Amino acid sequence: MSQPERFEVLVLGSGTGGKLVAWHMAQSGRRTAVVERQWIGGSCVNVACMPSKNEISSAKVTHLARHAAQYGTVTNSVAVDMATVRRRKREMVDRQIARHLQNYKATGAELIMGSGRFVERKTLEVILNDGGTRVLAADKVFLNVGTHAALPSVAGLDAARPLTHVEALELEYLPPHLVVIGGGYAGLEMAQAYRRFGSDVTIIESGPQLMGREDHDVSQEMRRILSDEGIQVLLEAELLQVRGQSGEKVALVVRTASAERNIDGSDILVAAGRVPNTAGIGLEEAGVRLNSRGYIRVNGRLETSAPDVWALGECAGSSQFTHISEDDFRIIRDNLAGRNRSTRGRLVAYCMFTDPPLAHVGLSEGEAERQGIIARVARLPMNSVLGAQATEQRQGFMKALIGESDDRILGFTMIGAEAGEVMAAVQTAMLARLSYSTLTDTAFAHPTMAEGLSLLFSNVPPRSVQRTTTKVA
């Protein structure tokens, strides 16, 4: 092995948390290198959050155009040009990558494109994408290697060469019948988008409900919305076998509670969970331990089992959202500056960008029940919100959990137009530890979706001397 090049900071993976660490460290005067195998800026910029939301927005325009007559606008027949959809998405991604490259140049962090593997503690061998090898060593190492789509072990599935979100976002044709394996957030977003573009869509979910972590009423409402758009949903459906080739013709054998059934389709999209990118990068040589699921073991400060080595983002088992990876960066940054911040107990918010979207922050009813937390529940259908009535976006509902003893907001869920923006107001109130009555008495602008918060929180049941933990319907 050649003599290593010395850096003060070495980052493996240029995703959200990793790039922010690198730019911060480089701006602080530390010699910093970032090793990235493929996607500058990570999956969010290239093949996940940003491009998928770009495509979802195209699908929403298609949907509105097809229903324009309901709003008094007369259109001729609507056609979808998938090549233009892809070009629009690609141009957006290219702009994001250009901004990233500008940030590397401005901060002085060196971006090295290649595949890295640890050969000893805090020493990385990099096989460069354009040929050659470099060996890098650093005082501090940060791991931000992310995850990739899991492929279920099903006879014939691998041979069928199914799509993941990566390939689905590059299609320039419209699948006649898309079969989505998995009823989680990414699968539902893509299922609705392709249905709106014009595909027949079937969702196969092995569990008893869509979005398994959500409360049953939330899952039921989303299933109703998707079914109303013509998406077929199969629950408690075990995929037994796949024949054929995705992109041509596929036949799937599925076992449901009632019987086995055959599903014929044209394309398969696998959206059945994620696997950490921790194999084959020499973490054992670096002294970095993994948990039983292959994620990097970290403490609340995101420190690994190896001294001066941190992990952040999805590979560290953090919630799989870009904003949580960014928060991981802030925790590491502040702790290196002498503070004592932790990931434990942080308030996690997220959105699913279906139409209408789902937004959630804090505890769900199910989580409160499992944790033995007594909570009061307030619920409001979106049809009761004047802004929803005015715009005829009446699907969904709001729901809040309130502490029994102190009137604090414990959790909030919304399916409805602008759910993410409304949720942000509740999230801010929760961070400030405000009583729910603060929102009850707030004069929200009229007629906005957020105005519904006053109605929602006016429906909070009074405290009771004896109350059992909320049961999930």
Put a short name on every predicted segment.
Residues C49, L143-D200, I204, Q232-V233, ...:
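Glycine-rich dinucleotide-binding loop and its adjacent helix/turn
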Residues L10-L12, G116, L124, V135-G146, ...:
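Short hydrophobic core segments
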Residues G18, G184-G187, S325:
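Catalytic nucleophile loop
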Residues W23, Q192, R223-R224, G366:
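Alpha-helical segments flanking ligand/cofactor-binding loops in enzyme cores
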Residues Q3-G15, L174-G184:
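Beta1/beta-strand and adjacent pyrophosphate-binding region of the FAD-binding site
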Residues L12-Q38, S43, M50, N54-V61, ...:
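Flexible, glycine-rich terminal cap/loop adjacent to redox cofactors
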Residues S2-F7, H24-R30, V35-L174, T202, ...:
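Glycine-rich flavin
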Residues D158-L174, N262-N335:
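FAD-site-proximal beta/loop scaffold in flavoenzymes
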